[in-house]
């Protein structure tokens, strides 16, 4: 998740940041995900929503409030209906512990694990920032004019990684890093 200044110095452009992020394969997400916090979307609130994914694409949307705004954002362009980011943020982060919901993604994303539908960050793939859009897509990166973060982290979130040999490794236990 780092970047490089024109002078060649590495830096993390989101300060302060609590997240470790990457890009999922644009066509590799399946299942249902529930939002843990409301989403402020272009001045409108979306509450208590979930998204269903099939082969990476959002195929079903439900929200108790603001569903039409969520649907409109997902339909902005073809890439808006695919994920571009997966970010891990411990539940006990300073932003979460403040107890404040800012309704501003740049702050709220540091309070919770989150996903984003829309564009992926090219820096998530080695050399991605120097690839053509076609090569980025081949490398698994989603492209869109949109990038909308929504929070999924909860106090009971469990994440288990699987290594190449099939070994399961706890990554998150009870909302926080397992190590």
What are these regions (language model features)?
Residues 1-179:
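Metal/cofactor-centered catalytic core regions of large enzymes
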